Regions:
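N-terminal single-pass transmembrane signal-anchor helix
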Residues: 2-36, 48
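Flexible, low-complexity segments enriched in proline/glycine/serine and punctuated by aromatic residues
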Residues: 16-20, 37-46, 53-244
Length: 244
């Protein structure tokens, strides 16, 4: 007669532990999926912001005004109609207050000595003034750029989720007066937020705003993001050629 040894139920206990651990892991799965989806949305928002930033950076590489883009003039300071008086011409050398002498940053003038003025807002926009397109900042006013894949504006037939991405650019003049302090005599000034005040007359500040929108049936995928920047009427340096 054989004696059968009694075995402890170790295997059963291990099975129970395994089931409990798997249950805990599965309970966290929905939360992990939710966080993964949110991370994807954040990633697409960051891509949109990066696209906006690149577009604004491109605009800021252009000349401040159409007059600056004219090759017969150095990219110098322009006279404005509605700017702060303390930022105007201060002496016969056509310097602005605070500019060292000598400097290329002088007010531009034509051959007759007449000061060159910044463009009117009525001349803002693509090819409005009849000159080369997109050679200065205000040419981008009203420009609507469509981001697409290989020319497909709807991205149909691709696996790209974001589609119908549009970037609309607005360029305006902004107030350049200080809230407190003096440009010429004070070491500290408090400056008004220029985007709170857009003007139809020319000033020393151009405000650039680019708004990105997407059209998507899913609410969480629709975007309406705006980035802004400004550029000042401060002229530019020009390279000198030394005779050897």
């Amino acid at each position: 007669m054989k004696n059968i040894a009694n075995h402890k139920a170790v295997a059963m206990i291990e099975l129970i532990f395994a089931i409990v651990i798997m249950a805990i892991a599965l309970m966290s799965a929905p939360m992990l999926i939710h966080q993964s989806i949110k991370s994807s949305f954040v990633g697409m928002q960051q891509e949109s912001i990066n696209t906006l930033s690149s577009h604004i950076s491109l605009i800021l590489t252009k000349e401040w005004d159409e007059v600056n883009a004219d090759t017969q003039f150095n990219p110098s300071i322009l006279v404005v109609d509605g700017g702060d008086d303390k930022l105007g011409i201060k002496n016969d050398n056509r310097y602005r207050a605070g500019t060292f002498n000598p400097s290329q940053r002088t007010f531009a003038s034509d051959e007759g000595g007449n000061a060159k003025k910044a463009s009117l807002t009525s001349n803002f926009g693509e090819n409005v003034d009849g000159t080369e397109k997109f050679n200065d900042i205000d040419d981008y006013d009203g420009n609507k750029a469509v981001v697409s894949i290989f020319g497909d504006t709807t991205s149909t037939g691709s696996d790209y989720i974001d589609n119908q991405i549009e970037m609309t650019t607005t360029v305006r003049y902004g107030g350049d007066s200080t809230d407190s302090g003096d440009y010429n005599s004070d070491s500290t000034i408090v400056f008004n937020h220029p985007f709170n005040e857009t003007l139809n007359t020319s000033t020393n500040i151009k405000l650039i705003s680019v708004q990105l929108t997407t059209k998507n049936e899913a609410t969480e995928l629709s975007k309406n993001i705006r980035l802004s920047a400004f550029a000042c009427n401060i002229g530019n340096y020009s390279l000198s050629i030394r005779d050897l």
